[in-house]
């Protein structure tokens, strides 16, 4: 967080006026008010070329970017640039030029121009791999009508409220097993508590959860002996993310030409992801074909196959993308949430009180409990404000639009700097503070176009509802069973590895909460 965990940001706040903390001050560029209609003016818009910029020489900019080790601190760079240039700026790195915005009203205006088939920025090394090796693609990479066709089907099976109800009995036991694992660790340590970095355990938890939802079967990732084939998949996903960053600003044509170790490792990671996902999908596909009746919900794979609204190749491609996207993202958010709770014990007690009251009122019915924990759900939003998975959201507007009195041509890459927004006092009071109650405010203007952790609109994260349910259930069981503390009082900074990760291990202390274990 700013004062405690982000020294750079703290220095910036002291050295520079807060972003938009006073309308019109500290910017040097005209800005209409921050209320309704902010960002829209009746004046003749200024040309795109006048948008503040560090310069139009993309390769020189990229040289300085690399020299300053900007790849892993790009989220801090956004903050610096907004302080320097104002609420909108453009930057060219190599061949890629983007316009960056931060104000929620500008974000709302941008999304009005996303069109029927919103387009995001495709991560170059990912796209290059799929093209070079002719891999099938799902909604992550599809565009226009083919994207829409798949997305409509997935919305029914993955996002709809009726579908989410089916996931509860699949995800809840995984969270309970994670709690059991921690209790075993406490007994093994023999000190009445467990102290450790549970990053790997959270990877296992997330993979066990997403595979259970996809296939309706457990893989045993929370057992004493972890499935080695499943571990290879998890390791490959980690390597895929980690090797993406050095390749982001390199022209894809050079990947195969120079065959650098980073590119070879990236290809090997994707190969493993596809091979393992194909293997799992085929095994469960054949198993499902042999069954005629199911006592319980059989998983997303079966429902997609049964609906016959997708070709088998498209089903496999989308399953692969959801498996790959469901490990590091959810596990990292949970790690950050535990970190924030451990540093804000008063908030942790508020959350625990809500959960325990919900358990009593719902008489143990977990489905009812999920409707009674608004503060807990708000705490997930708060974690994603401070530690968003992606540091920006991207759109290519369908037609010309005006932002901050500048004309933005159609199909310009516009990036919403959600990390910088979440850390700015103009948009969040006391932004350093972990305060879930801010999301329960009756003043909707305080949260308007600020909850962007999962994206927005029809192209928001397809796994959003699964992730929200998975994290809520996990936190319910953790709060009922343990008090979570930091082993050492100190700050943890963030680095950009395509997703935001801690710059060092986070060692947490889990102390059993003095009560009888809740009955499922």
UniProtKB/Swiss-Prot annotation:
Interacts with FDX1/adrenodoxin. Its EC number is 1.14.15.6. Transmembrane segments: none annotated. It is a peripheral membrane protein. This is Cholesterol side-chain cleavage enzyme, mitochondrial. Detected in adrenal cortex and corpus luteum (at protein level). A cytochrome P450 monooxygenase that catalyzes the side-chain hydroxylation and cleavage of cholesterol to pregnenolone, the precursor of most steroid hormones. Catalyzes three sequential oxidation reactions of cholesterol, namely the hydroxylation at C22 followed with the hydroxylation at C20 to yield 20R,22R-hydroxycholesterol that is further cleaved between C20 and C22 to yield the C21-steroid pregnenolone and 4-methylpentanal. Mechanistically, uses molecular oxygen inserting one oxygen atom into a substrate and reducing the second into a water molecule. GO terms for cellular component: mitochondrial inner membrane; mitochondrion. Pfam families: p450. Residues 1-39 form a transit peptide. The lineage of its organism: Eukaryota, Metazoa, Chordata, Craniata, Vertebrata. One of its GO terms (molecular function) is heme binding.
């Amino acid at each position: 967080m700013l004062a405690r965990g982000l020294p750079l940001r703290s220095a910036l706040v002291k050295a520079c006026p807060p972003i938009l903390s006073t309308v019109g001050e500290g910017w040097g560029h005209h800005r209409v008010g921050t209320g309704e209609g902010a960002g829209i003016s009746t004046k003749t818009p200024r040309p795109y070329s006048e948008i503040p910029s560090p310069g139009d020489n993309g390769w020189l900019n990229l040289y300085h970017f690399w020299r300053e080790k900007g790849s892993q601190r790009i989220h801090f760079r956004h903050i610096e640039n907004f302080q320097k240039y104002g609420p909108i700026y453009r930057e060219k790195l190599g061949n890629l030029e983007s316009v960056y915005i931060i104000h929620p009203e500008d974000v709302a205006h941008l999304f009005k121009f996303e069109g029927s088939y919103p387009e995001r920025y495709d991560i170059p090394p990912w796209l290059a791999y799929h093209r070079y090796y002719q891999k099938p693609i799902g909604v992550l990479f599809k565009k226009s009508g083919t994207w829409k066709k798949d997305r409509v089907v997935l919305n029914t099976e993955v996002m709809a409220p009726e579908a989410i109800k089916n996931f509860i009995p699949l995800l809840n036991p995984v969270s309970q097993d994670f709690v059991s694992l921690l209790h075993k660790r406490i007994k093994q340590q023999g000190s009445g508590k467990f102290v450790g970095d549970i990053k790997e355990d959270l990877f296992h938890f997330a993979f066990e959860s997403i595979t259970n939802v996809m296939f309706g079967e457990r893989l045993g990732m929370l057992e004493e002996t972890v499935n080695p084939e499943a571990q290879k998949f998890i390791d490959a996903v980690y390597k895929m993310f980690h090797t993406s960053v050095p390749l982001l600003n390199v022209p894809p044509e050079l990947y195969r030409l120079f065959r650098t170790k980073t590119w070879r490792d990236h290809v090997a990671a994707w190969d493993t992801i596809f091979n393992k996902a194909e293997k799992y999908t085929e095994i469960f596909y054949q198993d499902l074909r042999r069954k005629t009746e199911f006592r319980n919900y059989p998983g997303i794979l079966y429902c997609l196959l049964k609906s016959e609204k997708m070709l088998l190749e498209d089903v496999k491609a989308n399953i692969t993308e959801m498996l790959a996207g469901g490990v590091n993202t959810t596990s990292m958010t949970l790690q950050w949430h535990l970190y924030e709770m451990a540093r804000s014990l008063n908030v942790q007690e508020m959350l625990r009180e809500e959960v325990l009251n919900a358990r009593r009122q719902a008489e143990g019915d977990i489905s009812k409990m999920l409707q009674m924990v608004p503060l807990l759900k708000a705490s997930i939003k708060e974690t994603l404000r401070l530690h968003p998975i992606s540091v920006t959201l991207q759109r290519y507007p369908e037609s010309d639009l005006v932002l901050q009195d500048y004309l933005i041509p159609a199909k310009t890459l516009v990036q919403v700097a959600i990390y910088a927004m979440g850390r700015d006092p103009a948009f969040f009071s006391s932004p350093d503070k972990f305060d879930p109650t801010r999301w329960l405010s009756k003043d909707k203007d305080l949260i308007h176009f600020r909850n962007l952790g999962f994206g927005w609109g029809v192209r928001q994260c397809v796994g959003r509802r699964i992730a929200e349910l998975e994290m809520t259930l996990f936190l319910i069981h953790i709060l009922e069973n343990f008090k979570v503390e930091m082993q050492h009082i100190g700050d943890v900074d963030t680095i950009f590895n395509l997703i935001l990760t801690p710059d060092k291990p986070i060692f947490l202390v889990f102390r059993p909460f003095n009560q009888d274990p809740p009955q499922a």
